[in-house]
Amino acid sequence: MKQQQWCGMTAKMGTVLSGVFTIMAVDMYLIFEQKHLGNGSCTEITPKYRGASNIINNFIICWSFKIVLFLSFITILISCFLLYSVYAQIFRGLVIYIVWIFFYETANVVIQILTNNDFDIKEVRIMRWFGLVSRTVMHCFWMFFVINYAHITYKNRSQGNIISYKRRISTAEILHSRNKRLSISSGFSGSHLESQYFERQSFHTSIFTCLSPVPSSAPSTCRYTIDVC
């Protein structure tokens, strides 16, 4: 069966390229952000602005590169798991990748908004936004293939479960009918052996009765009647 293609690629090929793209894009993003976020500027919050939102914003700004590094490491692991999920057709791995990429890009947008004002050079701010928007758009493009392949994998797994369920039912029916035939045949053979046993017993009893000694006053003749079935 010919698989449907989009932009000259099947859903499986697009999913593989999505994982490869994510790994390469995350590496390039870390190289670029290490120079600009490595020495994050942390400023102490004055009591006037000591609110919950200000504390959270200051924490994100101070730990921005460490947060980006942690998220990128998790993203690379999930991308590798995506490639294995394509090979092994694991539906859960595809779903994890879809959910995580959405969370990863959302977190990067938040970090970008909070830290972009710290750079005085306008070109740096433009390059950071250009890289983030380009990566997000490409992830949306590749996500189309991942979602389609996840749908195909789920459908194939459902069909496989139905086939295995029907196979188990047919196997159980065959075993039940076989056991039923065996019980019927064993019943017939048992009744036949029982009838033969009683016939032999009656035959031996008649012979023993005929050969047993009789009184002298009784007739000396003995009639043998043997019925053979």
From Swiss-Prot:
It is a multi-pass membrane protein. It is found in: Membrane. The chain crosses the membrane at residues 13-33, 67-87, 94-114, 129-149. Glycans are attached at N39, N156. Its main location: membrane. GO terms for cellular component: membrane. It holds the Pfam family DUF4534. InterPro entries: DUF4534. Keywords: Glycoprotein, Membrane, Transmembrane, Transmembrane helix. PANTHER family: TRANSMEMBRANE PROTEIN 217. This is Transmembrane protein 217.
